[in-house]
Amino acid sequence: MLRTTGIYFIILVMILVKCFLPDEKPEIIPFPLQSVSDKGDFTFNKATLISVENEKQAMIARELTDLFTLSAGFTPEIKIQDKRANIIFRTDRELAAEHYKLNIAPSCILIKASGQKGFFYAMQTLRFLLPPAINNQTQVENIQWNVPGMTILDGPRYSNRTVAIHTPFTLISKDNLKELIDHLAMLKINRLHFTQEVHDTTPEGQQKMKDMNLYAKSKKITISNGTTHTHDIISYLPFQAERLIWKANISDCDEDKKGYSNI
């Protein structure tokens, strides 16, 4: 009798602890302003249908569905104003610019925002909530493409969220730089600065360049990868714009000087 009572007591304590523990935080960077976990998961599959209000929203939704094409081997369909959809884009003018509300239930996902930026950032949050394999460039087998049930209300804490890249010392290829821009968009970065100053006229600057060349040689990396040319950097701008990462004014520099500043 005492043993049975002890077991019941342990079960009761476990239930109480579970009730009073805070909700597990979603693995989203940056962490949302508000998030409340709910029961159940929403599963993406071949039958998933996304309803949007216009073509601009469709372009944003396509950023996500293209990931499924590569990694999952299926592409969720996108239609305008389709009542059968289980993922719904809905404009809410009461939400501030760049803010969004995401309601995830087992049967549907409702995405609210006042404009393009909010819907785009909601897509980035969904990308975080999906299994990491969603970012694979080749198809992955035996994956349940689930996102946990929850309600998220989110928006930026800062209007300018900037990353600066010092191109003379950036030892990555142009393709890798585009991949970096894509990941910056996931983090909801909205400005990218390319700096062009090369401090090789001082002894310290010359030593730095020498060390960089030695390091690059040891890693079989070519420093003069072309990322510092004005025309190359300009070629990234449409790619950045699709991911809502903006620039400042291009300085009036000629290509021979590899000049590009104030971005």
Where are the language model's segments positioned?
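Acidic, contiguous N-terminal accessory segments
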Residues: L2, G6-P156, N249, D254, ...
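Feature activates predominantly on carbohydrate-active enzymes
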Residues: L95-I263
